[in-house]
């Protein structure tokens, strides 16, 4: 009987003391692998990968799941002079040039320097931003434009005008069947040369003229997309010329299921929210503060997960940060690039980011070695 009681006690103890494994609060806690996929340098020597997007369509040169990366610098490493888009196909591990746009394109004010503003419409048309420079600084910047390419990488038309000035950050979008709504940060308004110094900070002066532009686009498979309307839905974001980074301004844009637009402001080290982004008729200013400082260190490009969390690349270190925007909570920081050659480690190495097709991981670029990588569980 005594042995039976002891046996029962031991068995019950196993159940009592069995460890409970907590469910991950978000995506980053599940990420454990970082894999190199390809170099992002094409034959012409362009460097400094910026935008990363995943094709959701199969058309022309594009297959669903293809990754496209653009370059901001030319072979001389001058910022605002990159003209190429590279395609990587995960299914075959093939890397090839998708598009090369003439640097002195006449209908783009100032020429071509491809930025983080890039997206593929469901009809296969690609939109990419240009914020050009002649000498690699804002001293010789042009207003730039939005370039429309077909699914074979050919330039077909250019969008420019008074509301398009320095298209800079991620393009967030809402699909509506025969039309699409795009949200793009415009960071070029009133930005001076980096030689214009604030006497107090001893850094280039900070302006607060960056804006978020909403574009309503008509699209079909066969007709070149056209702009139906343009509306400034947010303004007052900080921007500053910078010799090392060309420009500091609002870079990350992501749209939630409730049509709230989230925006990163690197100079103010914060993320804000613009409610009713699809339907609002006037500017919300900088919007509602979601989170500031903490794990953020110059937040740049940003994506949104299936759970509605934001994944943000830090510019001042090699970390990404996960944020619950509804509860305004910073959840987790994860190292993607801990290169000790920079201080802090990974400083300036991260920029573009895109969710993988299975939503379990994400693609990102490393500027220090001009590469595309994937982060997975």
Model-predicted regions and their roles:
Residues 88-92, 215-225, 274-282, 323-330, ...:
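Short loop/turn segments immediately following beta-strands, especially the blade-tip
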Residues 82-91, 141-153, 206-218:
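Beta-propeller blade signature
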Residues 41-65, 80-82, 102-126, 131-133, ...:
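Beta-rich, blade/repeat-based domains predominating
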Residues 72-74, 130-133, 141, 185-189, ...:
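Short loop/turn segments immediately following the C-termini of beta-strands
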Residues 81-82, 141-145, 196-202, 206-209, ...:
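A detector of repeated loop/turn-to-beta-strand junctions in beta-rich toroidal repeat architectures
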Residues 266-270, 291-337:
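Loop/turn-rich, solvent-exposed surfaces of beta-rich toroidal or solenoidal domains
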Residues 24-45, 91-112, 148-167, 218, ...:
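Surface-exposed loop and turn segments in beta-propeller and other repeat-based domains
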Residues 77, 85, 135, 146, ...:
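Structural signal for beta-propeller blades
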């Amino acid at each position: 009987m005594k042995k039976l009681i002891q046996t029962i006690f031991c068995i019950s103890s196993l159940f009592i003391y069995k460890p409970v494994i907590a469910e991950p609060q978000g995506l980053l806690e599940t990420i454990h692998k970082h894999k190199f996929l390809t170099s992002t340098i094409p034959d012409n020597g362009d460097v400094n990968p910026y935008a990363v997007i995943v094709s959701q369509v199969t058309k022309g040169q594009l297959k669903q799941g293809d990754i496209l990366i653009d370059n901001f610098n030319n072979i001389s490493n001058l910022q605002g002079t990159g003209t190429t888009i590279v395609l990587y196909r995960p299914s075959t591990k093939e890397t090839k040039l998708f598009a090369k746009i003439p640097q002195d394109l006449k209908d783009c004010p100032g020429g071509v320097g491809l930025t983080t503003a890039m997206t593929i419409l469901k009809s296969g048309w690609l939109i990419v931003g240009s914020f050009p420079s002649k000498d690699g600084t804002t001293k010789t910047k042009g207003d730039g434009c939005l370039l429309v390419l077909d699914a074979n990488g050919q330039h077909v038309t250019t969008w420019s005008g008074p509301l398009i000035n320095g298209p800079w950050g991620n393009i967030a979008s809402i699909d509506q069947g025969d039309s699409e709504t795009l949200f793009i940060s415009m960071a070029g308004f009133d930005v001076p040369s980096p030689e214009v110094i604030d006497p107090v900070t001893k850094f280039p002066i900070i302006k607060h003229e960056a804006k978020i532009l909403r574009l309503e686009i008509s699209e079909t498979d066969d007709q070149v997309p056209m702009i139906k309307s343009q509306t400034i839905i947010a303004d007052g974001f900080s921007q500053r010329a910078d010799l090392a980074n060309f420009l500091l301004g609002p870079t990350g844009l992501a749209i939630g299921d409730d049509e709230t637009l989230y925006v990163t402001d690197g100079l103010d080290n914060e993320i804000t929210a613009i409610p009713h982004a699809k339907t609002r008729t006037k500017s919300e200013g900088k919007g509602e503060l979601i989170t500031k400082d903490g794990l953020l260190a110059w937040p740049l490009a940003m994506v949104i997960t299936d759970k509605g969390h934001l994944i943000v690349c830090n510019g001042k270190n090699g970390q990404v940060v996960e944020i619950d925007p509804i509860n305004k909570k910073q959840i987790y920081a994860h190292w993607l690039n801990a290169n000790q050659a920079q201080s802090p480690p990974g400083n300036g190495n991260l920029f573009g980011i895109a969710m993988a097709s299975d939503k379990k991981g994400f693609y990102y670029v490393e500027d220090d070695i001009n590469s595309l990588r994937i982060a997975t569980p």
